[in-house]
Regions:
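Aromatic/His-enriched, Gly/Pro-containing loop or helix-boundary segments
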Residues: 73-94
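Short, glycine/charge-rich beta-strand/loop segments that flank catalytic centers
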Residues: 83-87, 110-115
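Conserved "HGTGT" condensation-loop signature of ketosynthase/thiolase-family condensing enzymes
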Residues: 1-79, 112-164
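Hydrophobic or amphipathic alpha-helical targeting/insertion segments
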Residues: 96-110
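Short glycine- and Lys/Arg-enriched binding-loop motifs that mark or flank ligand-binding interfaces
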Residues: 10-12, 84, 107
Length: 164
């Protein structure tokens, strides 16, 4: 049986985004509240009007409480997801499938990361089960090594790849 997707069952009706920059005056919870408030206000809602939330984060929180507390959500499920560099996409995918399944009428996916407040100099090299070899490269460093090889393999100009 082939999949026909969910594009006719789900609509993205709003979005919000804080500026990509160093926010020395704000914490991760402030950025999350700003993005969610911007998103809901654009369609005349408040955060508690949403049925369920999916929070995508890696370094900024270990549970859905990272969203539930600052947003003052009462009785709303918040699921935290993490999928390395696809964390935001994973949150959106889960929220979309929750609506498509009929479990919820409205769902909101939100991603937040603020690594420098936690003492990091940047995203660290995530540990996962391996052969025991110490990993020393961060995700960004690994991708910077892969990008030129990808460009050569697929005949893409590296300048075009940099603009993505």
């Amino acid at each position: 049986m082939s999949s026909h997707g969910i594009s006719d069952q789900v609509a993205i009706v709003s979005m919000g985004c804080t500026p990509f920059k160093e926010h020395w005056d704000k914490g991760a919870d402030d950025l999350l509240v700003d993005a969610v408030t911007q998103t809901t206000a654009a369609v005349g809602l408040v955060p508690n009007d949403i049925d369920a939330y999916w929070l995508g984060t890696s370094q900024s929180g270990a549970s859905g409480m990272m969203a539930a507390g600052p947003l003052k959500l009462e009785g709303k499920p918040v699921s935290r997801v993490e999928n390395y560099c696809a964390t935001g996409s994973e949150a959106l995918r889960n929220a979309a499938y929750a609506v498509a399944s009929g479990a919820y009428d409205t769902a909101l996916a939100v991603g937040v990361e603020k690594v420098k407040d936690g003492g990091y100099q940047g995203l660290n090299a995530f540990p996962y089960p391996t052969d025991g070899t110490q990993r020393t490269l961060t995700a960004a460093a690994m991708f910077s090594l892969v990008a030129p090889a990808y460009a050569r393999r697929y005949g893409i100009d590296e300048d075009d790849l940099r603009r993505v």
